[in-house]
Structures are given as C-alpha cells and as structure tokens.
C-alpha cells in the first residue's frame, strides 16, 4: 500500500468526513554566481506530504516530510478541528479526474540535466553580460523537476509532472561617481525556449544605460515598467489582495470593492493559467480541478477573486 493510500485508509478508519493527501517530489539544481564567476553548483532532492482534513465542515491542513509519521499527523489534524469554526461555504472535494493536457509544461531535457550542463548555461549568462564598463556580475540559475501526486477520499487520484527553469543576472558598475546596476531575468518551462544570452544582454544594457544618470525636472511623467518589475508588483503586491481567503476575512485592501471600480477604465488584469512557458501554467490545480482563465479586473472593475 502506498503512503497516500495508507493515509486515506487511516482517515476513513477514524471517521474523518473527507481527506486529501498530496506528495510533491522535487529535484532542484542551483548554480550560484558571485564576483563574475560560478562559485557553487548544488543538486537537492526533497519530498513533502500535505494533508487536508475536512470534518463537520471544519478544515485543517498539515505538512510533513516524514512518510512514517503521516498517520500520526492525521490524528493531530483531527484534534485541530475541535478548535476550528465550520466553513459553511464548503461543498466537498472534487471526485472527477480532469484530463486536459497543456503542451510545454514538462521537458525531459530539464529533468535529466546534469550539473555540468547547468553550469554551461550559467556561464553563457555571465559571458553575455560581460563588458569593460561592468565591474561585477552576480546571479543564479535554478532548475526544478517536480512530480506532484494527489489522492482524496472521493476517489480522485492524479499525477502531474512539471519542469521549471529560471535565471537572473545582476550587473554592477562603478565607472561613474554613482554606482549603478542592471537586472536580466527570464524563466520558463522548457530548455529550448530559455535564452541565457538574453538574460546577460538585458542586465548589461540596463547597467550601461544607467551610467551617468541625469536629473529631470519635477513634474508628472508616464512610467514604463520592465517585465521583471511588473512580475514583482503582481506577485508580491497585487496577487495577495485578490485571494478569496484574504478577501473573505476582510484583510484585503479590496475587501469592500468587489464588483466596484478600482482602477482606470483602460486597465485589465487576467489570471491565465494556460500561458505558454508560464511558471504558474497548469491544466489542473492542486485540488484536481480543471483550471480556467479568470478576469480579475475588467475595464477598471474588480470582477473576480483568485481561488488557491
């Protein structure tokens, strides 16, 4: 009996209404760049188990890395539900396996990549960012091979394999009185669509273009954000405020603005889980439900929250 099956059997034996168990296995390759050279190459493997219990509409979540302690974790989770409030919105775990498949979310070449091949990619990032006006280059390359498996007490059982690659270079210059820097960044899901040279070029060009900055007069200006900056804003500033849980608990700055205007008419924001090469692209979410495109803001109006 597998660890996941053992967990579900145990939850049923002790009378839990619903149970969901996931295991995530990751092979992670990291190349670290400091002082314009590769200083570290490491490969790690980790395995994590996640358990969600629903009992009398009370929801408890537990995480462990020890498969031998998974039944004990379920016992502790059941005790936790005694102190929780019921979630009346709860309608049950999914029981239908979705079969939608998206191309470009798994690459066998990334799964099988060696440390030396990863180092070659990182070296290309360094080489393309070198310039006589640049003094120091730092950065990193990360490659992840992920195996996600989910089982629940409704009979749903599915497995999903993914690969990810992400690189970043920070080029610094002290050629002028004021130190400046430039960032190059790219990420994706397949090796063929990933360009280490573009990362280095972007960092180099931004850094060189920032040398000897000029003052401007006070006034109102339009700002054009780099894609990397937009990603940072969306990930760490905007996304959390659209989370359904955050909204329902009145912790979002938009909690009182659902279906109301929150931005300029020209602004639209969409959560698209099917974008090619997207880091968050997936056909099925972590509960086994088919993903779909969601309009968060349409013509300035807050239309939908994010459920995750």
What residues fall within each predicted segment?
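Transmembrane alpha-helix/helix-exit interface in multi-pass inner-membrane proteins
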Residues: 307-308
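Active-site bordering "gate/hinge" segments
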Residues: 1-282, 286-292, 298-301
């Amino acid at each position: 009996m597998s660890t996941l099956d053992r967990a579900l059997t145990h939850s049923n034996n002790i009378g839990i209404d619903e149970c969901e168990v996931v295991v995530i296995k990751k092979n992670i390759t990291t190349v670290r760049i400091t002082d314009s050279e590769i200083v570290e190459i490491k490969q790690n493997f980790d395995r994590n188990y996640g358990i969600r219990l629903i009992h009398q509409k009370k929801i408890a979540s537990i995480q462990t890395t020890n498969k031998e302690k998974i039944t004990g974790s379920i016992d502790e989770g059941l005790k936790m539900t005694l102190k929780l409030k019921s979630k009346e919105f709860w309608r049950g775990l999914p029981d239908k396996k979705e079969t939608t498949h998206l191309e470009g979310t798994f690459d066998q070449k990334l799964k099988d990549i060696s440390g030396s091949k990863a180092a070659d990619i990182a070296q290309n990032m360094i080489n393309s960012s070198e310039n006589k006006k640049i003094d120091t280059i730092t950065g990193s390359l990360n490659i992840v091979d992920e195996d996600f498996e989910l089982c629940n007490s409704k009979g749903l059982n599915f497995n999903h394999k993914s690969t990810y690659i992400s690189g970043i270079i920070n080029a610094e210059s002290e050629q002028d009185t004021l130190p400046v820097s430039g960032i190059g960044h790219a990420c994706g899901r397949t090796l063929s669509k990933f360009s280490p040279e573009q990362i280095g070029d972007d960092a180099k060009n931004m850094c060189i273009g920032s040398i000897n900055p000029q003052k401007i007069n006070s006034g109102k200006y339009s700002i054009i954000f780099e894609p990397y900056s937009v990603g940072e804003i969306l990930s760490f500033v905007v996304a959390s405020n659209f989370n359904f849980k955050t909204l329902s608990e009145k912790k979002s700055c938009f909690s009182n603005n659902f279906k109301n205007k929150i931005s300029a008419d020209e602004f639209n924001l969409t959560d698209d889980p099917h974008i090619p090469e997207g880091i968050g692209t997936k056909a099925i979410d972590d509960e086994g439900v088919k993903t779909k495109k969601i309009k968060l803001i349409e013509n300035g109006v807050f239309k939908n929250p994010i459920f995750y």
